[in-house]
């Protein structure tokens, strides 16, 4: 009996010592959160937000991405879209005159940007070309045509239209001006009212060239005749 009692007491003492040792080894409550490094994210805490870039530091690529994001998020009106993203206007073939190819071009260029080259006659300076084409642009503006103008030479300018459907009407106006030598539209050159002087000068030059060639031929034939006569005398 004494031995069994002593054995039970020994077991109790060992269990108590093991429990005390376990309590000493365990960290106090809340110490895990305190010991966690502030720089390492916990599973329960959300990741830190990425710092936004200052808009003053944006480059061209950042602005392009921002514009693309706006286009995705916002409903942009059809007229504000870039030209290559606008849907093509439907062509009504019932209004096309087969005998007039220009009518087909007008329908296909509707709502599209179009450029035409205009040449001023009379060998003007760049300043004179600026003044003359400015008057033409003003007349078109008064007729409710939206036209932009760019000087590209001493006697040449570009007229740019946002709606190519009206290009041929503007061409008809320009070729009727006294100082318009010609208009180039869609690869086609249309002579203007002021282009006659160039044709006259060209005709005069051709006549003078032919006259010189004729004089040279007559001189050479005379020299040949003289040489032949000398040979016969010998």
UniProtKB/Swiss-Prot annotation:
Its main location: endoplasmic reticulum. Residues 31-58, 71-93, 187-234 are annotated as: Disordered. It holds the Pfam family Mesd. A motif (Prevents secretion from ER) lies at residues 231-234. The keyword Secreted does not apply. Gene3D superfamilies: 3.30.70.260, 6.10.250.640. The keyword NAD does not apply. One of its GO terms (molecular function) is low-density lipoprotein particle receptor binding. Residues 165-204 are annotated as: Escort domain. One of its GO terms (biological process) is phagocytosis. It comes from the Eukaryota. Glycans are attached at residue 201. Residues 1-33 form the signal peptide. Keywords: Chaperone, Endoplasmic reticulum, Glycoprotein, Signal, Wnt signaling pathway. Coiled coil: none annotated. Residues 71-80 have a biased composition (Acidic residues). It is found in: Endoplasmic reticulum. Residues 196-234 have a biased composition (Basic and acidic residues). InterPro entries: MESD. Residues 1-164 are annotated as: Chaperone domain. One of its GO terms (cellular component) is endoplasmic reticulum. Monomer. Interacts with LRP5; the interaction prevents LRP5 from forming aggregates and chaperones LRP6 to the plasma membrane. Interacts with LRP6; the interaction prevents LRP6 from forming aggregates and chaperones LRP6 to the plasma membrane. Interacts with LRP4; the interaction promotes glycosylation of LRP4 and its cell-surface expression. The chaperone domain provides a folding template for proper folding of the beta-propeller (BP) domains of LRP5/6. The escort domain ensures LRP5/6 safe-trafficking from the ER to the Golgi by preventing premature ligand-binding. Belongs to the MESD family. Chaperone specifically assisting the folding of beta-propeller/EGF modules within the family of low-density lipoprotein receptors (LDLRs). Acts as a modulator of the Wnt pathway through chaperoning the coreceptors of the canonical Wnt pathway, LRP5 and LRP6, to the plasma membrane. Essential for specification of embryonic polarity and mesoderm induction. Plays an essential role in neuromuscular junction (NMJ) formation by promoting cell-surface expression of LRP4. May regulate phagocytosis of apoptotic retinal pigment epithelium (RPE) cells. This is LRP chaperone MESD. It comes from Pongo abelii (Sumatran orangutan).
């Amino acid at each position: 009996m004494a031995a069994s009692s002593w054995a039970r007491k020994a077991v109790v003492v060992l269990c108590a010592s093991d429990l005390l040792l376990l309590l000493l080894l365990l960290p106090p409550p809340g110490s895990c959160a305190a010991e966690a490094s502030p720089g390492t994210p916990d599973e329960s805490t959300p990741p830190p937000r990425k710092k936004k870039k200052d808009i003053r530091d944006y480059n061209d690529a950042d602005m392009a991405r921002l514009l693309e994001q706006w286009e995705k998020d916002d409903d942009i009106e059809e007229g504000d879209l870039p030209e290559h993203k606008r849907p093509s206007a439907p062509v009504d073939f019932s209004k096309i005159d087969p005998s007039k190819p220009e009518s087909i071009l007008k329908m296909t260029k509707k709502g599209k940007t179009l450029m035409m080259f205009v040449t001023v006659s009379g060998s003007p300076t760049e300043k004179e070309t600026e003044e003359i084409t400015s008057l033409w642009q003003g007349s078109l503006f008064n007729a409710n045509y939206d036209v932009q103008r760019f000087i590209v030479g001493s006697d040449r300018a570009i007229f740019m239209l946002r709606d190519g459907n009206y290009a041929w009407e503007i061409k008809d106006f320009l070729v009727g001006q006294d100082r318009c030598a010609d208009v180039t539209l869609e690869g086609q050159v249309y002579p203007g009212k002021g282009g006659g002087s160039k044709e006259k000068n060209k005709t005069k030059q051709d006549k003078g060239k032919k006259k010189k060639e004729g004089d040279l031929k007559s001189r050479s034939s005379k020299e040949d005749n003289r040489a032949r006569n000398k040979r016969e005398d010998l």
